[in-house]
Amino acid sequence: MFGSKTLFSWAAKRSKDFYRKKSKIDNFRSRAAYKLIELNSKYRFINKEDVVIDVGFAPGSWSQVAKKLVGNKGKVIGIDIQHIAPPEGVLPIYGDIRDPNTLTKLFEALRLLHEPNTNDSIDCRVVDAVISDMLHKATGIRIRDHALSMELCASALHVALTFLKSNGSFICKFYMGDEDADLQNLLKSHFRFVQVMKPKASLKESREAYFVCLERKP
């Protein structure tokens, strides 16, 4: 007979294999695509013709999903420190999001999207959704992994607060721990709706979850 731990491990492995195999069939770059699909199916933060920034877009599955959701008239900009080929239709910006030069590149990209034939300045808050599936490679030390994820969330939030329009949305992956409540309170000061969700495509034993932040306050 199988013990409870063995059954749990078997079920988790089966779930992981299901989404990995499905991602290959659906031509997504990773199984993470289904996390965004589920999140957006429930909260509808990405719509046709939207402008979306994908922070830390490698390997590109979230950008793939976002581009399908916004359609031909929408725009998806992916930012990453890794120089990987972007999914079709996604504009890549390579650099560290903590580097002001990277944000300058992002601002210029947004300006060209909206006013390609002028050098006039524009309001940089023109983005409908900022999404982030970033997470440091796990160290195995929970406190350390949590602290690192909080740093990444803070960096992604800075991008969101710089470029999101009023009523825009921010989605961010994090590693659960003691600082969750502090970050959630900070998010509530900037967004009218903040909720934590763990998609079905996430492994049950994983401590990852997502902050879903909707309706940015003016």
UniProtKB/Swiss-Prot annotation:
Active-site residues (renumbered): K173 (proton acceptor)
Function: S-adenosyl-L-methionine-dependent 2'-O-ribose methyltransferase that catalyzes the formation of the 2'-O-methyluridine corresponding to position 2791 in S.cerevisiae 21S mitochondrial large subunit ribosomal RNA (mtLSU rRNA), a universally conserved modification in the peptidyl transferase domain of the mtLSU rRNA.
Gene3D superfamilies: Vaccinia Virus protein VP39
A Gene Ontology BP annotation from the UniProt entry: mitochondrial large ribosomal subunit assembly
Catalytic activity from the UniProt record: a uridine in 21S rRNA + S-adenosyl-L-methionine = a 2'-O-methyluridine in 21S rRNA + S-adenosyl-L-homocysteine + H(+)
EC number: 2.1.1.-
Gene giving rise to this polypeptide: mrm2
Name of one Pfam family that matches: FtsJ
Record family assignment: Belongs to the class I-like SAM-binding methyltransferase superfamily. RNA methyltransferase RlmE family.
Location in or out of the cell: Mitochondrion
GO molecular function, one term: rRNA (uridine-2'-O-)-methyltransferase activity
Residues that coordinate or bind S-adenosyl-L-methionine: P59, G60, S61, W62, D80, D96, I97, D133
Keywords recorded for this protein, A-Z: Methyltransferase, Mitochondrion, rRNA processing, S-adenosyl-L-methionine, Transferase, Transit peptide
Protein name: rRNA methyltransferase 2, mitochondrial
Main location: mitochondrion
GO cellular component: mitochondrion
